[in-house]
Amino acid sequence: MVEQLLLPLWNSLATVDDETLPLMSTALLIARDEYPDLDANLYDTLVQSYVEYLRSEVEEISLWPLKMAAVNRYLFQKLGYSGNHDEYYDPRNSYLNQVFERRLGNPISLAVIQIEVARRLGIPLDGVSFPGHFLVRLPVDDGILVMDPFNGGRPLDAEELRERVRPHLGGEVPDDRALAQILNPAPHRTILVRILRNLHSVYANTNRWDRAARCADRILKLVPNQPEALRDRGLAYLQLGHRSGARNDLTRYLQLYPSTHNVDMVRGHLVDLSNERIQTH
């Protein structure tokens, strides 16, 4: 009997340890919100077929970087997975089932596939929540090898990494210690939240507030009382006319994050909501 891939339950995720939170399964759970008929077993079987194709070649290689090079050749050259440079903000780039089907994705979704295949082959690949552009990292004898899944798994040296991160640090070039901290492995929860934040951004920027609210709500399932997600869900509820939900979320946001830079904006919305409430009584 073929073992079935069981997706986790949203209400259970907050209490799951980061070490045991399944990355690909939870990414597929995110996709199931948009594609309710998604067959998770189909994609689990697909990944396993990649692993079986690569297994004998990878087992004959002794060095991690060369093992990973074989994985990258297969995924990005033979199978044709690639970054969607032309339609970067297409939400399908974040939904893992669509990335498998179209072999197009954004940096983080391609990284999830890369990590899943590598880990099943015993390769200790991790994600890196790099500013602006998600990356992956592999331990090597003299440090780490950092790769760009959006561009075929291309290795990146320290100089290029510093140049990439500099605009996100106000033009400052990080020293070795600061760069090492930026390149720390990302826990699965962090990766999944970033997928959802990407989707929220796409939907909010295109005024699809029901989906924006859903993405913020899912972040709160992963990280209860996460301040930015409370704010984002509250603002989405406001656009949807869910006044009580908006008031509750925005009030809680200010309780958790009283020094936020957008405190005046949030307080303004709460004043408007209070005035509306008074006028209706």
UniProtKB/Swiss-Prot annotation:
Record InterPro entries:
SirB1_N (IPR032698), TPR-like_helical_dom_sf (IPR011990), TPR_rpt (IPR019734)
* Top-level taxon of the source organism: Bacteria
Q: Which UniProt keywords apply?
A: Repeat, TPR repeat
> Does the record bear Repeat in its keywords?
yes
Q: Which SMART domains match?
A: TPR
Q: Do you know which PANTHER family this protein is assigned to? A: F-BOX ONLY PROTEIN 21, SI:DKEY-261L7.2
Protein's UniProt name: UPF0162 protein XF_1494
Species whose genome carries this gene: Xylella fastidiosa (strain 9a5c)
